[in-house]
C-alpha cells in the first residue's frame, strides 16, 4: 500500500502502520464515490479494517452510494481519529488517514458474516456486541456489505507524537 499522489506537507506524514492505527481508532469514515454522471458524493459510514481490507455496510442496496459504486468502484475513505481546534493558534491538531481502493459488494455468506463481525467488534465492542451480532443475524439479508481492497493508504497528523499516545 503506497501513496499515489505526493503529500504537500511531508513533515506531517505518518507511517502506514500509524495510518492503520488511525483507521482502527476512528469512530466512522467518510466514503467518497463518483457517479456515472461525474458528480461526487460523500457520506459517513461505519467501517472496519480486517485482514488487509476495509468493510462497511449500508441499509439497502438501492441507494446513491450503491449506484455510484456499481458504475465506478473506485472509492476513497477518510478517517479522522483525533481533532482538537487550537483557536489561539489558528490551527487544528489532528490524526487522519485516507484509503483509496475498489469497492465490491460482498455476496459470499462466510465473508458477509466475517464483515458483520468486524464491524460489530469495531463499533460495538464490549457488552453491546451480542446485541449487535443478533441484529446482524436477524437483519443481515437486508444490509448491503461492501469490501474495499486498499490500493493506497496514507496518513497525516499535526502533533502525532502527542496524539499517538492518546490513541493507545
Task: Tell what function each PLM region has.
Residues 11, 20, 54, 64-67, ...:
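Anion-coordinating catalytic cores for phosphoryl-, nucleotidyl-, and glycosidic chemistry
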Residues 27, 43, 50-52, 71-75, ...:
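A generic structural signal for short beta-strands and their flanking turns/coil linkers
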Residues 26-61, 77-78:
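Short beta-strand segments
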Residues 2-11, 82-168:
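Charged, gly/pro-rich active-site loop segments
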Residues 23, 68-69, 119:
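A generic structural signal for nonpolar/aromatic side chains embedded in well-ordered alpha-helices
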Residues 64-88, 92:
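Helix-adjacent hinge/juxtasegments
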Residues 2-30:
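Short, basic/aromatic recognition patches
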Amino acid at each position: 500500500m503506497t501513496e499515489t499522489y505526493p503529500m504537500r506537507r511531508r513533515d506531517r506524514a505518518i507511517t502506514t502502520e500509524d495510518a492503520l492505527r488511525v483507521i482502527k481508532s476512528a469512530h466512522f469514515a467518510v466514503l467518497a464515490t463518483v457517479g456515472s454522471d461525474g458528480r461526487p458524493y460523500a457520506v459517513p459510514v461505519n467501517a472496519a479494517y480486517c485482514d488487509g481490507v476495509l468493510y462497511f455496510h449500508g441499509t439497502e442496496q438501492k441507494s446513491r452510494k450503491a449506484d455510484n459504486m456499481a458504475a465506478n468502484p473506485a472509492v476513497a475513505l477518510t478517517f479522522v481519529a483525533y481533532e482538537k481546534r487550537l483557536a489561539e493558534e489558528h490551527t487544528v491538531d489532528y490524526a487522519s488517514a485516507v484509503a483509496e481502493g475498489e469497492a465490491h459488494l460482498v455476496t459470499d455468506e462466510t465473508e458477509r458474516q466475517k464483515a458483520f463481525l468486524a464491524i460489530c467488534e469495531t463499533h460495538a465492542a464490549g457488552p453491546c456486541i451480542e446485541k449487535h451480532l443478533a441484529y446482524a443475524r436477524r437483519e443481515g439479508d437486508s444490509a448491503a456489505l461492501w469490501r474495499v481492497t486498499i490500493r493506497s493508504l496514507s496518513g497525516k497528523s499535526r502533533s502525532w507524537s502527542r496524539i499517538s499516545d492518546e490513541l493507545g
